[in-house]
């Protein structure tokens, strides 16, 4: 179908063009921006619902504030596609989340209109406060700093830490609370809009401050009564008492889709000389696109789709994704053991725990965007004899590292960590890559670290974790599908710290930790065809290492190559340290480690990027050839 005409949007290259429009044109411009956003994501896939929910807010912010001199910080960045279209990136917007194209999140290196990069939630207020204080220290002319944060992100403690600090500093910071679940308070029509305009006027705020000064001279009894009366009135009408207690001047709630309500409030707040302000806007995810509005997840993250029907393009496959294999295995284990509980930090669908909750709703806990709390909550349950499984993306586990050490590992509490999206994740790029969990977990004493080579092994590791009560244990698995193995009804319990041999050879040893095993097996076939007898080992455990197996491989082979989808300092590094301590590097053994490069990998196709960095069969074969002094060449791919 032909694309929707966008005559107004076509005139906008950067926000200064937008600011030349009369206010009467902005609603039509917002409609065009919404149509363009829908069209873009229908082609690229990505996050749609959040962006559709902030179309009018995005237009209003760039219209009122002098970006990029004024700073707009988008929390998480899921909602920033319309922002990118308005800020000079429309020509490249259909490269979104593709290798060499635009990021799916805000990114400082991409545009001056992205003052702070994002991907994880709840960072915007802290970053904005830092910018506001820095601006004040430099004695710059008044610069507006605006942090836009969703109500979901407000469930994280970091947001309140920042607000508490901003209130204490009386910093000149504007926070826009995008309440897209109406979880705090709905707007109440004309009265709410009128009140928001009234209380946002500088004259009202100035009068309020003067009354406060005068009130300090009154007896405490009268002062308390006056304060409580105002708090009751404003809290009853607009729900802002909590934010006022944190030192913010509260305005709202207002309809975030009504430009006639948004513009005067933003203009009023723009003129405030001091103090932090919170503007509470209520929006609806997926606004203006019926399939998104009707969907339970509001099209939060989607594949390419048909605009007319909303039907997403999905590859047909009977192979289960690793996430579904995990959730199936955990639900099976829970049917045998009523002490098994599951914990997620606001990702029940992404981690597969929604499937677990269908059968055991009372044993699944979604704690919100609160990874630190999730881990210590699990530790508390472990203290009382329960078997908590914390299902979490590798990238988000980073946020709870102190809790992993202090609350779990030191106390040797049997918390189970199911680490999803391990390794390179593809289109979401550097902020979501699961690069570091092997490194930061294998450094912890007596912490068991596993990785399955396929989906059957994943089922074994779920059962192994359920049976292990001696301390913390983890297993990591990637985004995407398995390799199509027939799945048992239930996994088996593995012996802790024992790997396995998949193919016996006598010259080359390929030791894989994780799901690159299929590429390793292809490489082994190619090496064998070249006359290089090859052993393939599935390590299973990075910690504890299978020391007997590693000694044998080191003594019986000329070249040993480790393969893992993790950062420097992981499985290969631990194996090298062991070999050095054992004196196994002193008799001619050639060791090479294949891993993720020492850089932050940008978005792109999983298969293409992993091939480019050498974590495929071609890269493995060429690594062996290089170790042997053979000429590196392009290898014909053989699929098994």
Swiss-Prot record:
SUPFAM superfamilies for the chain: Thiamin diphosphate-binding fold (THDP-binding), TK C-terminal domain-like
Biological or metabolic pathway of the protein: Metabolic intermediate biosynthesis; 1-deoxy-D-xylulose 5-phosphate biosynthesis; 1-deoxy-D-xylulose 5-phosphate from D-glyceraldehyde 3-phosphate and pyruvate: step 1/1
GO molecular function terms noted in the UniProt entry: 1-deoxy-D-xylulose-5-phosphate synthase activity; magnesium ion binding; thiamine pyrophosphate binding
UniProt KW keywords: Isoprene biosynthesis, Magnesium, Metal-binding, Thiamine biosynthesis, Thiamine pyrophosphate, Transferase
Cofactor binding summary note: Binds 1 Mg(2+) ion per subunit.
CDD domains: TPP_DXS (cd02007), TPP_PYR_DXS_TK_like (cd07033)
Ribosomal protein listed as a keyword: no
InterPro entries in alphabetical order: Dxylulose-5-P_synthase, THDP-binding, Transketo_C/PFOR_II, Transketolase-like_Pyr-bd, Transketolase_C, Transketolase_CS
Disulfide bonds: none
Amino-acid positions noted as binding thiamine diphosphate in the UniProt annotation, renumbered to this chain: 78, 119-121, 152-153, 180, 289, 371
One Gene Ontology term from the biological process aspect of the record: glyceraldehyde-3-phosphate metabolic process
EC number in record: 2.2.1.7
Cofactor(s) needed for function: Mg(2+); thiamine diphosphate
Similarity remark: Belongs to the transketolase family. DXPS subfamily.
PANTHER family: 1-D-DEOXYXYLULOSE 5-PHOSPHATE SYNTHASE-RELATED, 1-DEOXY-D-XYLULOSE-5-PHOSPHATE SYNTHASE, CHLOROPLASTIC
Entries under NCBIfam families matching the protein: dxs, PRK05444.2-2
Reported function: Catalyzes the acyloin condensation reaction between C atoms 2 and 3 of pyruvate and glyceraldehyde 3-phosphate to yield 1-deoxy-D-xylulose-5-phosphate (DXP).
Protein name in the entry: 1-deoxy-D-xylulose-5-phosphate synthase
């Amino acid at each position: 179908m032909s694309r929707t005409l966008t005559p107004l949007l076509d005139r906008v290259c950067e926000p200064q063009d937008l600011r030349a429009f009369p206010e009467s044109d902005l609603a039509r411009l917002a409609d065009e921006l919404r149509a363009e956003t829908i069209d873009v994501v229908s082609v690229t896939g990505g996050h749609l619902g959040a962006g559709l929910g902030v179309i009018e807010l995005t237009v209003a912010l760039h219209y009122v504030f002098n970006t990029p001199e004024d700073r707009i910080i988008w929390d998480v960045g899921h909602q920033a596609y319309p922002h990118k279209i308005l800020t000079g990136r429309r020509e490249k917007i259909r490269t979104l989340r593709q290798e060499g194209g635009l990021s799916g999140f805000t990114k400082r290196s991409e545009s001056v209109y992205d003052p702070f990069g994002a991907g994880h939630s709840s960072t915007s207020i802290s970053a904005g406060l830092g910018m506001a204080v820095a601006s004040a220290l430099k004695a710059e002319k008044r610069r507006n700093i605006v942090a836009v944060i969703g109500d979901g992100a407000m469930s994280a403690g970091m947001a309140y830490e920042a607000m508490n600090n901003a209130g204490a500093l009386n910093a000149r910071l504007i926070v826009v609370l995008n309440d897209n679940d109406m979880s705090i308070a709905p707007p109440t029509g004309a009265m709410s809009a009128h009140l928001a305009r009234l209380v946002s006027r500088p004259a009202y705020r100035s009068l309020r401050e003067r009354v406060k000064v005068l009130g300090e001279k009154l007896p405490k009894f009268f002062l308390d009564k006056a304060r409580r009366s105002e708090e009751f009135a404003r809290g009853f009408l607009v729900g802002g008492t909590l934010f006022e207690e944190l030192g913010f001047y509260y305005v709202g709630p207002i309809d975030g889709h009504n430009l006639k309500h948004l513009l005067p409030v933003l203009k009023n707040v723009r003129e405030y000389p001091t103090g932090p302000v919170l503007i509470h806007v209520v929006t609806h995810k997926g606004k203006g696109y019926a399939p998104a509005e009707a969907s339970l997840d509001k099209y939060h993250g989607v594949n390419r789709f048909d605009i007319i029907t909303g039907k997403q393009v999905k590859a047909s496959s009977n192979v289960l994704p690793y996430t579904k294999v995990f959730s199936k295995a955990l639900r099976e284990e829970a049917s045998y053991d009523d002490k098994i509980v599951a914990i997620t930090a606001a990702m029940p669908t992404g981690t597969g725990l929604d499937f677990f909750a269908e059968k055991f709703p009372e044993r699944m806990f979604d704690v919100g965007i609160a990874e630190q709390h999730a881990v210590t909550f699990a530790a508390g349950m472990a203290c009382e004899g329960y078997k908590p499984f914390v299902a979490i993306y590798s990238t988000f586990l980073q946020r709870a590292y102190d809790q992993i050490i202090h609350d779990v590992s030191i106390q040797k509490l049997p918390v189970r960590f199911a680490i999803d999206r391990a390794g390179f994740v593809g289109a979401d790029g550097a902020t979501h890559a699961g690069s570091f969990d092997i490194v930061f977990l294998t450094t912890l004493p007596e912490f068991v670290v596993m990785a399955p080579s396929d989906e059957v092994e994943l089922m074994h590791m779920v059962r192994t974790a359920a049976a292990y009560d001696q301390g913390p244990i983890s297993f990591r698995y990637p985004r995407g599908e398995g390799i199509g193995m027939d799945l048992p009804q239930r996994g088996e319990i593995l012996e802790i710290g024992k790997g396995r041999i998949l193919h016996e050879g006598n010259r080359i040893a390929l030791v894989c930790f994780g799901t690159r095993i299929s590429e390793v097996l292809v490489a082994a076939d190619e090496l064998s065809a070249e006359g290089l007898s090859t052993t393939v080992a599935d390590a299973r455990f990075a910690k504890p290492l299978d020391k007997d197996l590693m000694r044998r491989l080191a003594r019986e082979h000329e070249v040993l190559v480790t393969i893992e989808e993790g950062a420097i300092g992981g499985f290969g590094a631990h194996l090298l340290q062991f070999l050095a301590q054992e004196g196994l590097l002193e008799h001619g053994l050639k060791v090479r480690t294949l891993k993720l490069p020492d850089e932050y990998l940008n978005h792109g196709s999983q298969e293409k990027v992993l091939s480019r960095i050498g974590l495929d069969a071609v890269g493995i074969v060429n690594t062996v050839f290089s170790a042997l002094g053979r000429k590196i060449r392009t290898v014909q791919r053989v699929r098994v």
